[in-house]
Amino acid sequence: GPISLDPAAMILHYGQEVFEGMKAYRAVDGRILLFRPEENFKRLNLSNERLCIPLVDVEKCVELTKQFVNLDKDWIPSAPDTSLYLRPFIFASDPHLGVRPGKHYYFMIIASPVGPYYPEGLDPVKIYVETEFVRAVKGGTGFTKTGGNYASSLKAQAVAKEKHYTQVLWLDG
C-alpha cells in the first residue's frame, strides 16, 4: 500500500535508490518458478555498492521472495507469455538536506501481473540510434539499476516514440 515520506526524504532530493526486476511464472506442470533470483539480487548489490546503500543478504532475499510469491501465487497469470513481474527496490528515507549516504532505508517488493515486455513479440522492432544524448560514461553509474539512469533516458525515448521507433540504441558519444 501507500507509504508516507517526509518532504526532505533523501530519495526525493538525491536519488539514492536502486531497483531490480525479475519474473515469477507458471511452468507447464503448474509449478511456480522464479527466473534467476540469485543473479538479480547479486546485481542489486552491485548497484547498492555503487550508490553507498547497504548490501542485502542474497540468500535471505531469495528465500523471502519465494515466500512472498507463494503468498501471492494467485496473481501469477497462466496465459502464454505472461508472468508476475517482481520489482525489489531500496531507497534512502531519512529526512536530510545535504549530500551524504542515507542512514535509513526502505526495502520493498512490488508485484504486478504482466504480458510480454515487447508487444511486437518476435517481430522486428525499429531501433532509434541516439547520437546527441549520453546515457552512460566510463566510471559513471550506467551499469546500475537506479532511477536517475532511466530518468535521463526519457528525452531520447520521447524522441524515438515521436518518430515511431520502439527502442533506443545508445552510442554514448
Regions found by a protein language model. Name each.
Residues 75:
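Active-site phosphate-binding and catalytic loops of NTP-dependent enzymes
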